[in-house]
């Protein structure tokens, strides 16, 4: 059974959580992305759901990227780390709330989530997808507001932005390939039970 784990902030807590459940994994060496035994793959967070949907048996990713990707995967567990939120933020000196953002240009790494949010409140906006620091888009005047991940809010404050609405809460999720869920039912079920045991201990 293979695991695809996200590079970046979720990697360390993912490994620690799996180890608490007795799942010992050999990690890739140095800059390598696949472990020597082929059981562990490291991928960009946004790509983890795609790998799981298309064949890697198990993965861990944030609920933000799973929703944004719209990947068809089985999600047996919400995990107790990676907690943050996706929010709407605007310049502090031009504070506006989402209901008043008709015709605004919104910069985001999450166009699907942002579009769905503004559609749900009946506000017509232009959503612009960016891959880098979306805060820069407002500072340079190419966007009126952003929709982005917020943990402490420090990055927003450093860029003169204020959070005006929460779009969704985010946490890490356990992802399982739908075919593997059936073909490797016993193995997958054993893994889920081990992880659930760790969750119950921490409750």
From Swiss-Prot:
<dbReference type="InterPro" id="IPR001348">
    <property type="entry name" value="ATP_PRibTrfase_HisG"/>
</dbReference>
<dbReference type="InterPro" id="IPR018198">
    <property type="entry name" value="ATP_PRibTrfase_CS"/>
</dbReference>
<protein>
    <recommendedName>
        <fullName>ATP phosphoribosyltransferase</fullName>
        <ecNumber>2.4.2.17</ecNumber>
    </recommendedName>
</protein>
<keyword id="KW-0028">Amino-acid biosynthesis</keyword>
<dbReference type="InterPro" id="IPR013820">
    <property type="entry name" value="ATP_PRibTrfase_cat"/>
</dbReference>
<keyword id="KW-0808">Transferase</keyword>
<dbReference type="GO" id="GO:0000105">
    <property type="term" value="P:L-histidine biosynthetic process"/>
</dbReference>
<comment type="function">
    <text>Catalyzes the condensation of ATP and 5-phosphoribose 1-diphosphate to form N'-(5'-phosphoribosyl)-ATP (PR-ATP). Has a crucial role in the pathway because the rate of histidine biosynthesis seems to be controlled primarily by regulation of HisG enzymatic activity.</text>
</comment>
<keyword id="KW-0067">ATP-binding</keyword>
<comment type="pathway">
    <text>Amino-acid biosynthesis; L-histidine biosynthesis; L-histidine from 5-phospho-alpha-D-ribose 1-diphosphate: step 1/9.</text>
</comment>
<keyword id="KW-0368">Histidine biosynthesis</keyword>
<dbReference type="GO" id="GO:0005524">
    <property type="term" value="F:ATP binding"/>
</dbReference>
<dbReference type="InterPro" id="IPR024893">
    <property type="entry name" value="ATP_PRibTrfase_HisG_short"/>
</dbReference>
<dbReference type="GO" id="GO:0003879">
    <property type="term" value="F:ATP phosphoribosyltransferase activity"/>
</dbReference>
<comment type="similarity">
    <text>Belongs to the ATP phosphoribosyltransferase family. Short subfamily.</text>
</comment>
<keyword id="KW-0963">Cytoplasm</keyword>
<keyword id="KW-0547">Nucleotide-binding</keyword>
<dbReference type="GO" id="GO:0005737">
    <property type="term" value="C:cytoplasm"/>
</dbReference>
<dbReference type="Pfam" id="PF01634">
    <property type="entry name" value="HisG"/>
</dbReference>
<keyword id="KW-0328">Glycosyltransferase</keyword>
């Amino acid at each position: 059974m293979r695991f695809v784990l996200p590079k970046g902030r979720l990697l360390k807590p993912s490994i620690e959580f799996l180890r608490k459940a007795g799942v010992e994994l050999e990690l890739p060496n140095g800059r390598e992305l696949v472990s020597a035994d082929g059981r562990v793959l490291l991928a960009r967070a946004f790509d983890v759901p795609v790998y799981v949907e298309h064949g890697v048996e198990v993965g861990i990713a944030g609920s933000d990227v799973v929703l944004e990707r719209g990947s068809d995967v089985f999600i047996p567990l919400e995990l107790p780390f990676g907690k943050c939120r996706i929010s709407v933020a605007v310049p502090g000196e031009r504070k506006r709330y989402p209901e008043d953002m008709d015709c605004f240009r919104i910069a985001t790494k999450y166009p699907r989530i942002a579009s769905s949010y503004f559609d749900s409140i009946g506000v017509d906006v232009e959503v612009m997808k960016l891959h880098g620091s979306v805060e820069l888009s407002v500072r340079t005047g190419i966007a009126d507001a952003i929709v982005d991940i917020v943990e402490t809010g420090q990055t927003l404050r450093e860029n003169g932005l204020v959070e005006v609405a929460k779009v969704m809460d985010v946490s890490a999720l356990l992802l399982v390939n739908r075919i593997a869920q059936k073909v490797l039912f016993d193995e997958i079920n054993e893994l889920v039970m081990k992880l659930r045991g760790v969750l119950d201990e921490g409750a």
